[in-house]
Amino acid sequence: MAKVNEWKTAISTDATDLISLQHMIDCGITAMELSVSAACVHEIDWQGLRDHAAAVGMEVWSYHLPFADAINIAAPDESARAAAVARQCGLIDLANAIGVRRFVIHPSAEPIPDDERSAWMASAKKSLAELAEYAAARDSVICVEDLPRTCLGHTADEMLELIAVDDRLRVCFDVNHLCTAYGCTHAEFVEKLGDKIVTTHMSDYDFIDEKHFFPGVGLINWKSLIELLEDAGYDGPFLYEGGFSPSHWAPEKPYGTIETARERHMTIKELTGAE
């Protein structure tokens, strides 16, 4: 059972240049998730990323597939759903060609009207089954991310329903996406999905809505959360998503730096929050 100090320190980033990757390595960040907005995916220099990562010893751990209303794999309209899946498959091919094997995906866009939720869920499950098959043929895995608010996957039970369509689907646990309004705690999530969690998005929040604060700025009891993941056998990276610039939701809050990311990871169990 890997302890948190044995996990790699990682970051979700759009950086692909040699200088940025070298700086991350110098700061103890040895793995990365590539995450680029839907509007900018055509600008990704895939071969440059491969070469730069190899040159500095950076592992390209995962690729966060883009998310936008126009790339909604849960779209009830079949033509829109199929187009979204096709676009994601094309991006999987590009990342797979440089050795990326883990693909994080949002199971839906938002908002979802209550009376349409079942239709969105059916579309998402159809899409995830297709994507799981496509990824598996390329020795890769789809990592379904839990989401906040009215999005699909806002509870452990919805996540279980989503990934049940294919045994090869796995989970990206975004720890700041479980909103109190929907009644799912970190403990319940890890209890029900712990054996499927293969990657994470680490940031802090207030339990009301996502905030992407630097760990320690919000209310998460990190000691408790990390022990849940350790006990579940998690051995992926401590992968930051956000927290290195002012939060979109609360810009007045303090934030961390690339230089302090590794230290915060190594001392994370000292933070007991107010959970």
Where are these regions (language model features)?
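Conserved beta-strand positions
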Residues: 11, 32-34, 105, 144, ...
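Residue-level detector of anion-binding/catalytic polar loops
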Residues: 30-31, 59, 101, 141, ...
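Active-site-proximal loop/turn and secondary-structure-junction residues that shape catalytic pockets
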Residues: 15-17, 36-38, 66-69, 109-111, ...
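N-terminal pre-domain/capping segments
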Residues: 1-96, 170, 195, 255-275
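Metal-dependent catalytic neighborhoods of phosphoester/phosphodiester hydrolases
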Residues: 43-46, 114-115, 249-251
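Catalytic-core regions built around general acid/base machinery
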Residues: 46-57, 127-134, 188-192, 224-228
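Histidine-acidic metal/acid-base catalytic patches
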Residues: 1-6, 15-25, 101, 153, ...
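Active-site acidic/histidine proton-transfer and metal-coordination neighborhood
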Residues: 55, 74-170, 180
